[in-house]
Design a protein with these regions (language model features):
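Local alpha-helix boundary/kink/capping signal
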Residues: 15, 75, 151-152, 279
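Sterically constrained small-residue positions within well-ordered secondary structures
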Residues: 12, 36, 59, 72, ...
Length: 287
């Protein structure tokens, strides 16, 4: 009888000790960090960051925060991102990329016929221009330091709401065309166009599709694009400041009417420029 009474407390004690050990082990396990964004969006990882990496690409943090731009054509799925903190710690997380529905734009009775049935001469011209532009906007491992802050400035004062056509799938008179790589803003001809941040002009030229176009390097792989200008007032390698006038809005190139096409490439990714005009705290955050 006494032996039985002694055994019961011992079993209870061993069970309690085992439970405490399991609880301690569970509490020491951390939940993997992740963030979910759609194609063409930007995720961020704030807090004492030095270096950031995403899909074999790496770059410096901006003001202690890592930003991860997702190209509008990136395949939906799960990818690994990482950051190195000021304390030397390497951390990883998962970025979940969701498909972004393609807005369909069917343009009929296009007024500029040279853009409907493009001649061999203009096809050759466009190819030469693309050969100049593409190396400027693709990812580069050696980058100038960032000279911009987020959010960036507006590309025009009293900027109207964008037309929501970033990434649109387009047809012209029934013929498929490339997806739209920027955001269109319905501003009138002659509206001053402004640099959205400090930077250096990479290219200012007249192009077949983009019309009068300006490309500005803001450091850390961020390139801003301004298309269809009536005219531009800057030249390659010129240093510009945030809010500086770089030209006037117009309707040059392949357009149906006057507007400003504002585009952004960040570390080679074509992203919705609207995400750089909002408070960074409103971006999707790694948690």
């Amino acid at each position: 009888m006494n032996k039985l009474l002694f055994t019961i407390p011992m079993v209870f004690f061993l069970s309690l000790a085992s439970g405490q050990a399991q609880t301690k082990k569970a509490s020491s396990t951390t939940t993997p960090k992740s963030v979910s964004v759609a194609q063409g969006e930007v995720a961020r990882w704030a807090g004492n960051c030095l270096r950031c990496s995403f899909e074999k690409r790496a770059w410096s943090a901006v003001n202690g925060t890592c930003y991860y731009p997702v190209d509008m054509d990136m395949k939906p799925g799960h990818y690994t991102i990482s950051r190195r903190t000021t304390g030397g710690k390497l951390e990883t997380a998962t970025i979940n990329v969701a498909e972004k529905a393609c807005v369909q734009e069917d343009i009929t009775n296009f007024p500029k016929k040279e853009y409907v049935n493009v001649s061999p001469q203009n096809q050759a011209r466009a190819a030469k221009e693309a050969a100049v532009v593409n190396p400027l906007i693709r990812y580069q491992s050696s980058l100038r330091p960032a000279v911009f802050d987020l959010p960036v400035g507006k590309p025009a004062n009293s900027l109207p709401k964008g037309e929501g056509n970033f990434g649109a799938c387009r047809t012209i008179n029934g013929q498929p065309r490339d997806r739209h790589t920027g955001q269109d803003y319905p501003v009138g001809v002659g509206t001053p166009v402004l640099s959205v941040g400090n930077g250096r002009v990479l290219l200012a030229a007249n192009q077949f599709y983009s019309g009068n176009a300006v490309y500005i390097d803001h450091g850390n792989g961020l390139i801003s694009e301004y298309f269809h200008l009536k005219s531009y007032s800057v030249k390659p390698n010129q240093t510009v400041t945030k809010g500086q006038k770089i030209g006037f809005a117009g309707e040059t190139g392949r357009v149906t009417g006057p507007h400003l096409h504002f585009g952004v490439r960040w570390h080679g990714a074509c992203i919705n420029p609207g995400f750089l005009l909002i408070d960074p705290a409103d971006m999707q955050e790694v948690k």
